[in-house]
Design a protein with these regions (language model features):
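HhH-family (HhH-GPD) DNA N-glycosylase catalytic core used in base-excision repair
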Residues: 1-260
């Protein structure tokens, strides 16, 4: 992709838009973690399913999707009902679950934390949307949501599976989750159900892959994949689409595919 580095603004815009149009399509849902919340029609189920799928979204995508489906099976394919009504006896069998470093004890702690969120806020959407209305800044939202999630007693070990913006993490999985539920278009991929958060407030879900592609395209100079890099690349993408910068998450994925 070296030939793209010296593209003009107009050329880069055309490239990003072309790749966005190619990859922001329903046929790519099945192989992506977003397929897990797409398995449900009730938005409350989608929010829970999406949160747990995003939580384990690192590594091979096929393995992520397969393991996230196992999570849904553990919840009897009724995630919101499970989270709101499960007893200790219902939750204990989750300890047999393992996906890479996310083990059964982590799963139990996350389910109990999710139960607390739903008791206090009703839904995950209400937690995120009310937090944005209160703070008006997505960085503050990510910090507040994490504190609220771990407000109840839990095993400290599980905290590593919920990125901390206060420690400078890129928060890729949280930003991906936010993209799923905040972005609104007519493509049928993202849900766009959280209307109280503007798309312009979103940040790119930055990881090793999208970071490398962003650098190759000349969109990012910072070497570390941390929150500062997330801010930098999103600021650059806002020059191409101020109202919807994270639309180019699809483009960066596509650019990586094309470079292989």
């Amino acid at each position: 992709m070296a030939e793209y580095y010296n593209y003009s603004h107009e050329q880069m815009f055309d490239l990003l838009e072309t790749l966005h149009d190619k990859y922001n399509r329903e046929e790519f849902i099945e192989a992506d973690p977003i397929s897990i919340p797409h398995s449900f029609t009730d938005n409350r189920d989608r929010e829970i399913a999406g949160f747990f799928a995003a939580t384990i979204a690192w590594g091979n995508r096929k393995a992520i999707v397969r393991s996230a489906r196992r999570m849904m099976e553990c919840m009897d394919f009724a995630p919101y009902d499970f989270i709101t009504n499960a007893t200790d006896a219902d939750i204990e069998p989750l300890r047999s679950y393992v996906y890479r470093t996310f083990n059964g004890d982590d799963f139990v702690d996350f389910v109990r934390a999710a139960q607390s969120v739903c008791r206090r806020y009703g839904t995950f959407g209400e937690l995120f949307e009310s937090s944005f209305e209160r703070h008006g800044d997505m960085a503050a939202v990510l910090s507040h949501v994490r504190r609220e999630f771990f407000a109840t007693e839990h095993n400290y070990r599980c905290e590593k599976h919920f990125s901390s913006i206060d420690k400078g993490a890129a928060c890729k999985r949280l930003n991906m989750y936010l993209r799923w539920f905040v972005r609104r278009d007519n493509r049928g991929v993202d849900f766009g159900s959280w209307n109280r958060i503007p798309m312009s407030a979103l940040y790119l879900p930055l990881d090793v892959h999208s970071g490398n592609v962003s650098r190759e395209l000349g969109l990012l100079s910072r070497r570390q994949n941390d929150w500062k890099a997330t801010v930098e690349v999103t600021k650059t993408l806002r020059k191409f689409s101020a109202d919807d910068p994270v639309r180019y998450d699809f483009a960066l994925f596509g650019a990586g595919v094309n470079s292989k």
